[in-house]
Amino acid sequence: MQHTIKNVSETEQQLEIILSAEEFNPEVELEIQDAKKNIQIKGFRKGHVPVGLIKKLMGPAIEASVAEKLASKYFGEIAEKETIKPASRAQLDNFSFNDDQLTITLSYEIHPEFELKDFSGYSFVEDLYTVSDEDVQNEINLILKGHGTLVSVDEAATSNDTVIADLIKLDAEGKEIEEQKTENHHFNLEYLPEDNPFKKALTGAKAEETVNVDIEPKEEGEEKVSYEISVKEVKRMELPELTDELLKEITQEKFDSIDAFTQDVRQQLEEHFSGKSEQDLLESISSKLIEENPVATPSAMVDSFENMLIENAKRQFGGNFPAGFDDTELRASMRPNAVKHAQWMLISQKIAETNNLEVTDEDIKAYAEKEAEKNPSVKAEELINTYMSTEFKDYMIDTILKDKIYGIIKSSVTIQGENKAIPKHNHR
């Protein structure tokens, strides 16, 4: 067997395999014998069709089958010998038989070879969130809202109120467009951005007042859009008093002490924002390394990440897009993000390879024991058995390897903490 590897691009190769008659004839004979057992031709008993007739009728199909099987067999052997890192399945481009040899041509994508830039001089900022008493109370108020009551107030609307109003669109001359009138629209000001023109206009407005809103064009060629809004009612959320009885109802009797509940809310906030801080830091690190190492990406790898992003989007619609939805534009918009995912995978693999990182069974056990410490209701032995199972082990190896990769990076770069307040509207 002879073979020649040709580099087509940074991520593509073509492989030519030349096999002698001694190497491919046994497979041809097997295919002929298999066909002989199954083929049925009028005038011949099953299993007794002459070989010459089988070759005449099924020659091209037999040759194609032999080429595919031998291509698969020898590609695996060559990939191992030549340390090829395939990023896609090898495609059979062409094959040709003659009396003496079989020539097979395959194409496939590979993981690109590249040198990772030294990242030890990089600096990053890590947000350090401090949970205040006010933050805890705001979170409790969010929980209490589910049991609160919207009441009408004869006051100017605040930025947290709900304004009920009729709005009508105006034409360029300021005249009402009757067919574009909406009655009893609810403006939940609390959830509108600070720079939203409706929020700006309605904050401070009272019932029976009229305000005008102008929405300036975002792009050249677009026209200004104007509305007249007639305020009918201002409603404000009235929160109930947090009593022991209400606490039991809200928490399904998990807590019977307001102090314990408050402490739990604080702990949940601290854990959430600690996780957010870590995730934001890791995203900054990956973005910087991708920017400094714009590695070429195999299209099959990018396709895989694109499909993953599409599936995530489908889940937001309950598992499937609406009937008739064309995801072409969505895929196009997600493609750059999929490329970055692929680039980060290649960079991560390079860091793991350079530092000889691997995940052992002991690593998985240690991870399980650490997780069990966070949740006393779960026994470490049970977690170990779960994580070591066939269903979970690959996932755990991937998770722990990622931690090790980030550990290598974080130990090499400079990370400076920066105190930061928790966002005002924290809807976790």
Swiss-Prot record:
It comes from the Bacteria. Its EC number is 5.2.1.8. Transmembrane segments: none annotated. InterPro entries: PPIase_dom_sf, Trig_fac, Trigger_fac_C, Trigger_fac_C_sf, Trigger_fac_ribosome-bd_bac, Trigger_fac_ribosome-bd_sf, Trigger_fact/SurA_dom_sf. It is an enzyme of class 5 (isomerase). One of its GO terms (molecular function) is peptidyl-prolyl cis-trans isomerase activity. Keywords: Cell cycle, Cell division, Chaperone, Cytoplasm, Isomerase, Rotamase. One of its GO terms (biological process) is cell division. It is found in: Cytoplasm. Residues 165-240 form the PPIase FKBP-type domain. Belongs to the FKBP-type PPIase family. Tig subfamily. Involved in protein export. Acts as a chaperone by maintaining the newly synthesized protein in an open conformation. Functions as a peptidyl-prolyl cis-trans isomerase. This is Trigger factor. It comes from Prosthecochloris aestuarii (strain DSM 271 / SK 413).
